UniProtKB/Swiss-Prot annotation:
Record protein name field: Ribosome-binding factor A
Matching InterPro entries: KH_dom-like_a/b (IPR015946), RbfA (IPR000238), RbfA_dom_sf (IPR023799), Ribosome-bd_factorA_CS (IPR020053)
One CC-aspect GO term: cytosol
One GO biological process term: maturation of SSU-rRNA
Family statement: Belongs to the RbfA family.
Assembly and interaction partners: Monomer. Binds 30S ribosomal subunits, but not 50S ribosomal subunits or 70S ribosomes.
Record key words, sorted: Cytoplasm, Ribosome biogenesis
Any one GO MF annotation of this record: ribosomal small subunit binding
Protein's cellular compartments: Cytoplasm
Keyword Cytoplasm recorded: yes
Biological role stated in the UniProt entry: One of several proteins that assist in the late maturation steps of the functional core of the 30S ribosomal subunit. Associates with free 30S ribosomal subunits (but not with 30S subunits that are part of 70S ribosomes or polysomes). Required for efficient processing of 16S rRNA. May interact with the 5'-terminal helix region of 16S rRNA.
UniProt KW Hydrolase keyword: no
The organism's place on the tree of life at top rank: Bacteria
Length: 117
């Protein structure tokens, strides 16, 4: 039952954070495509880890901007979800997409080498 509740909370928090992106006033985020790939709430519900990716090259800048605005996201969660303790929001760069691209390139390279034999 606890796992189901945590998954429901993660889903709802992901929606709220996505809505929060439109409330950010930072001009550096204008016209940036930001995608939330995964949201993980810690077992004690004190941390919410948000894994973000972007098609833009400056993902590290985007992560820094989001981490600087994490208080706004925490307030948004507190206003919309009733919880005893509102989790601290932490944004991370999602390495999964980059890793899959590297793996695909390696596979293509191996296939080309095998065809050349």
């Amino acid at each position: 039952m606890a796992q189901y509740r945590r998954e429901m909370l993660e889903s709802e928090m992901k929606k709220l954070i996505t809505q929060g992106f439109s409330q950010l006033k930072d001009p550096r985020l204008k016209d940036k495509f930001i995608d939330i790939n995964m949201v993980r709430l810690s077992k004690d519900k004190s941390y919410l880890d948000v894994y973000v990716s972007s098609l833009d090259e400056d993902i590290d800048t985007i992560i820094n901007i989001l981490n600087n605005a994490k208080g706004m996201f925490r307030t948004l969660i507190a206003k919309n979800i009733k919880m005893f303790k509102v989790p601290e929001v932490r944004f991370h760069k999602d390495e999964g997409i980059e890793a899959s691209i590297r793996i695909n390139k390696l596979i293509e390279k191996i296939e080309k080498n095998e065809e050349g034999k």
